[in-house]
Amino acid sequence: MPIKKFDWSTLTRLEIYDYLQLLQKNIVNKRLTADAHYKILGNHIRKIAPIRVERKINYNVGRNNVIVGGQYNSEWDEENKKAITIFLYYCPFDKHLKMPAENFVFTSKNISDTILHEIIHMRQYRRRNFEYTKDYKSKEEQDHKRKEQSYLGCKDEIDAFSFNIACELYDRFGNRHKSIAKYLECKRPKKHCIYKYYLNTFNNDHNHPVMLQLKKKIKMYLPLAEMGKPFKNNNWIWY
């Protein structure tokens, strides 16, 4: 079923997060079945924008927690169907869960960041008339490492993750850009974050071409991270 026109540029990180936090009284420290938890959270997300929400099981999810994933489907978008899907991953052993406040805050931030990440992909594909882009050609011998590098080194992912990282850094450092620049050159960041994951994937090589592109993009996105959205206008994302 075709979707109505929607201006994706109106969504900001803080507004999505605040909207999700309206569920605190329904979710935080409430003993809910996994089905009930998903229904409450999923229905709320669907009211934000024309977004699909799916529940999945993942054995890496801790008890009383939810991991968030996302996907943009360019073929659905070209057919004017809902093209962004948010995946909510639950622990298979949680028949019931009682999510503490800090877990729900973390989940809400992840949902907000994932939605904006997928909107960036939407804009990328629309502006180039839905043409696919190539993955990065990794030279790693290990299959798992090669796949990770191929994915994270893709120009589309560098662009989208750069905004996510800029938001993480803004949360941590505010507008102290010198501190951010220093952090980006840190050999081994201590705090677990997307930037650290990139560094690990590319063998902690700050001069790797992918890392150089990533750092350049992060710095470009810092002013937009303060605004809470990755665009200054609604070109390609108002329909």
List each language-model region with its residue ranges.
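Compositionally biased low-complexity segments enriched in polar/charged residues
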Residues: 11-12, 27-31, 51, 105, ...
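Zn2+-dependent metallopeptidase catalytic core
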Residues: 23-49
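Active-site scaffold of zinc-dependent metalloenzymes
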Residues: 62-109, 119-126
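Amphipathic alpha-helical recognition patches that constitute DNA-binding helices
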Residues: 106, 110-111, 155, 159
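Post-HEXXH active-site segment of zinc metalloproteases
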Residues: 109, 125-153
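Catalytic Zn2+-binding segment of zinc metalloproteases
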Residues: 118-134, 159, 166
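Long, well-structured alpha-helical subdomains associated
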Residues: 144-157, 162-239
